């Protein structure tokens, strides 16, 4: 297919690759994120790189570039990627300007296999060389040949790359990349490498910069945040980091994800309890309640230790909402093992749980285990577990009816229901709250904070419908100011149902009456 030869030195003033225009204006991009918060934050960096190179978001037009940022944790992530790539094949045939790039953990794992399965893909890049994407795209365009570049170690710490934050009022900050654990079900350490920690000063500088730009909430990210500091010889570094973040003026909400039960220490619990802007919420992955299965998983803790952590957290932070991850059907799991998990879930009283059916991941020790659990058994156990957790979540949420929730309003509330006109946001303990603005009251902007009465509850959300304006309080925040300024800068109308939402902050858009 014909291409205009690129400028032999396609660099902008900052040294970044710029894309040739080919007489049709700036090329448009779309980033599709498949995976966890790490991937979503990486997608913000991909977006920043692309816009720095001259691309613009594909709003109301067909993209010239589609970038997939992939996950390799579960089999359905593979299926989702190749399904979407298949849908793009005919689009590529009729649009010779379209480029397709695949990055992230699945790209790091599958490498050239992606191009073999989907030869219409132009670029495959890994978790360690996100910054190379603009160069690889230009090389693929110039050479008219797919470019596959996977590095075995980190090229540049990702936070050094340009970043376009999806929301002005909230953001992620990476404190480390990679993982030193050896869980038998997980392929992430192979794909993201050994843990590398940023220095506290760099992290705090990024947090301050976010707050200065209007952010009121920051989430600290790492594969195992409470092992932060081991690389530079300070095992208490994470607790110190939480306290230091707590001293940053204007930062209203601090969250972090994810810790590991084996390394979760009381100094972190104390820092959470004693730092007012660290939110009363904790995500603590259980994975299994069976000590036998935990040993096979190489999780380095047992159920008694796990429950002890929850007890200590609730002793210091009585209103803490605790969430978890659970795998059902790990190889060798017996009915008794599963019953042990149900018992721990019942005792833990999680506010919610991310439950997963185990899927074989090639390259992991668990994938080689002979005693795989039949799919029908896994499905039946999964349904029993989710029924138990749904009941616990609903009961805990119903106990909040009659209390008030302080809600940070989300920009991603989804389509307004004609019958309820509800907006959405997150409470201090990270519960999803759908609320109405009473007649005569001022509507909030995304990033503002409202105080509303909880009037209803379901398993995974709260409802807040103030009877009148006297039950509703709005606090216009710096976050709302930042959101409004960003809208004006982009000459965009406030978010609507048709707006692209490539990266979000974990705010579901589903609303039920």
Swiss-Prot record:
GO terms for cellular component: cytosol. [4Fe-4S] cluster 1 binds at residues 36, 71, 105. Residues 398-468 form the TRAM domain. It is found in: Cytoplasm. Residues 165-395 form the Radical SAM core domain. It is an enzyme of class 2 (transferase). SMART domains: Elp3 (SM00729). Residues 1-22, 490-513 are annotated as: Disordered. Binds 2 [4Fe-4S] clusters. One cluster is coordinated with 3 cysteines and an exchangeable S-adenosyl-L-methionine. Residues 27-142 form the MTTase N-terminal domain. It holds the Pfam family UPF0004. [4Fe-4S] cluster 2 binds at residues 179, 183, 186. InterPro entries: Elp3/MiaA/NifB-like_rSAM (IPR006638), Methylthiotransferase (IPR005839), Methylthiotransferase_CS (IPR020612), Methylthiotransferase_N (IPR013848), Methylthiotransferase_N_sf (IPR038135), MiaB_methiolase (IPR006463), rSAM (IPR007197), rSAM_horseshoe (IPR023404). Signal peptide: none annotated. It catalyses: N(6)-dimethylallyladenosine(37) in tRNA + (sulfur carrier)-SH + AH2 + 2 S-adenosyl-L-methionine = 2-methylsulfanyl-N(6)-dimethylallyladenosine(37) in tRNA + (sulfur carrier)-H + 5'-deoxyadenosine + L-methionine + A + S-adenosyl-L-homocysteine + 2 H(+). GO terms for molecular function: 4 iron, 4 sulfur cluster binding; metal ion binding; N6-isopentenyladenosine methylthiotransferase activity. Its EC number is 2.8.4.3. Monomer. Belongs to the methylthiotransferase family. MiaB subfamily. NCBIfam families: miaB-methiolase, MiaB/RimO family radical SAM methylthiotransferase. This is tRNA-2-methylthio-N(6)-dimethylallyladenosine synthase. It comes from Kocuria rhizophila (strain ATCC 9341 / DSM 348 / NBRC 103217 / DC2201).
